[in-house]
Amino acid sequence: MARNDGIDRTVARNQDLETPDDVTKVQEHNEREKDSYSNQDIVPERTSLNVHFKAPMDDYVKMFEQMEQDGVISTRGLKPDAVKYGELIFDVNSAYFYNHGGYEFAKQFYADAYKAAAEIVGGEQYILSAVMHADE
């Protein structure tokens, strides 16, 4: 969202993830597990500023499978083409945060977004990870 045109933008989207491999790719990006990224907006020197509102306890696919085993969720009866995985993304251009209080304002914004996401999905138990990327 780094357009640098002076217009504040906020995007909230629910991204379907079709396969466990897609989930793994999202995890590698979200948790900064890769050695390099095609996204040129990522500044590796700032990764330590990223904030987890909920840190994953394992890899995303294993956590999902554990939720199934524990009865937290059920995929029984889903159609074969049903989408089992999703990613809820809140994206705001950096200029908005710079103009409204900087890093601390961004942390509070995303803390509030996390609370909203938990309500949207029916509770924190359905969220595998929630992270603010301050390095983008």
PLM regions: where:
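N-terminal nicking endonuclease/strand-transfer module with a His-rich metal-binding environment
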Residues: M1-E136
